[in-house]
Regions:
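Conserved catalytic/coupling elements of P-loop NTPase cores
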Residues: 11, 20-154
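N-terminal pre-Walker A segment at the start of P-loop NTPase domains
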Residues: 1-14
Length: 154
């Protein structure tokens, strides 16, 4: 997981509605929860590790604490969710009715996964208010190195 996956949500979380309207009306004093959801085991480990649930059984709905109701929830690697977990996440998002600010990350294009039938279109549009496509870290470092060399020559 690259640094942007961690740093961008940390920047967005404290911003007030009038500073950055698309991130919602939540204050910086609300809870910020990060969950790596790359696999079911990681979801359970993340939620249990944070003390949010005591256990999570397959087939049960994804339940997050009421504290997350008015905070920021970052979901890392949302593109790797199984179909069943996508349905659960969509149901939770529908139930939360916009009280929770959700930031999700994916290492692959979610739109391409929708087109391939691997990701729910409705969940894609529910999550995709603002999309940022960031080059892999290796490409960013390479471009930064080239820019540094060009500046030295001038």
């Amino acid at each position: 997981m690259n640094r942007l996956n961690h740093s961008l949500p940390n920047v967005l979380h404290p911003m007030a509605h009038d500073e950055f309207p698309f991130v919602g009306i939540l204050s910086a004093n609300t809870l910020f929860i990060g969950v790596n959801i790359a696999s079911r085991d990681r979801v359970e480990a993340s939620l249990v590790g944070l003390g949010l649930v005591s256990r999570w059984e397959p087939g049960e709905p994804l339940v997050l604490p009421s504290a997350a109701d008015t905070g920021t929830l970052i979901l890392h690697e949302v593109g790797s969710l199984t179909h069943d977990d996508q349905v659960r996440l969509l149901a939770w998002l529908d139930q939360s009715a916009g009280r929770t600010r959700v930031v999700s990350t994916a290492s692959a294009s979610l739109f391409a996964r929708v087109e391939a039938g691997l990701f729910l279109e409705r969940l894609y549009y529910r999550l995709n208010t603002v999309s940022l496509n960031v080059a892999p870290g290796s490409e960013i470092r390479s471009a930064a190195g080239a820019a540094k060399q060009a500046n030295k020559r001038q």
